[in-house]
Regions:
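Active-site loop segments of alpha/beta catalytic cores
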Residues: 128-216
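Membrane-interfacial amphipathic helices and adjacent loop/beta segments
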Residues: 109
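Glycine-rich, aromatic-flanked loop segments that form ligand/cofactor-binding clefts
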Residues: 19-35, 75-105, 124-167
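Glycine-rich anion/phosphate-binding loops
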Residues: 51-75, 120-138, 180-195
């Protein structure tokens, strides 16, 4: 149950949230995938060089980057500036996002012993900076904020491959040759995603999305 002062209540009649619920709306609401980020000159001015994960640890900067496309384009929803590997990085799995490459894993997931490296997420301590970013945003926004997490298959593909891949050979091999371990990994990553998006909603996000880039 959401608290009575949750932003979703005051924004319930926005075109975006009405569309999310399958209700009628005055016009088609619009937001853009990756609207916060590389396409905006003001993003590059504030972002600087280095890993995105360093930027994401600063709630004020992350909130500002989230707000930039809202000011520029007048979109109907803001999407949190973050990355799907953040929860895994925050529980100590050894993840970085290398400019020009993408997520790179220090020690890729390979065996049953690697499950021990995927402990449960405690959002209040592990991703406190993410929740602070959400809180800053909902105080400023007059439109819904979308939170998100990586869906289990896509996050697993990064953790197993160790970096972006063209054929996901290691992922397919694990699925086919050790289905028991694969399902245990899916369970751990499902719990990780649920804990992450639930905490974002409780912090003030009005909608959430799972990104599953490699499932298709």
């Amino acid at each position: 149950m959401l608290p009575s002062d949750h932003p979703m209540h005051r924004l319930a009649d926005s075109d975006y949230l009405r569309a999310c619920r399958g209700k009628g709306h005055e016009r088609v609401p619009v937001w853009f995938q990756r609207q916060a980020g590389r396409s905006l000159p003001e993003y590059h001015a504030i972002r600087g060089a280095g890993s995105i994960l360093k930027t994401l640890r600063d709630p004020e900067v992350s909130a500002e980057i989230t707000l930039q496309p809202v000011r520029r384009y007048g979109v109907d929803a803001a999407i949190l500036y973050s990355d799907i590997v953040v929860p895994a990085e925050c529980i100590g799995f050894g993840v970085d996002v290398v400019p020009g490459v993408g997520p790179v894993i220090e020690q890729p997931f390979r065996t049953t012993s690697d499950l021990e490296r995927l402990r449960p997420l405690d959002p209040e301590s592990d991703t406190a900076h993410v929740l602070k970013t959400v809180e800053i945003l909902v105080d400023e926004l007059t439109i819904p904020l979308i939170g998100f997490a990586g869906a289990p298959f896509t996050l697993a593909s990064y953790l197993i491959e160790g970096r972006p891949s063209r054929d996901y050979a290691n992922t397919k091999s694990l699925m086919l040759n050790d289905p028991g371990l694969w399902h245990q990994l899916m369970d751990r990553l499902t719990d990780l995603a649920v804990a992450s998006i639930r905490s974002q909603v409780m912090a003030g996000a009005s909608a959430v999305q799972l990104f599953d880039s490699w499932a298709g």
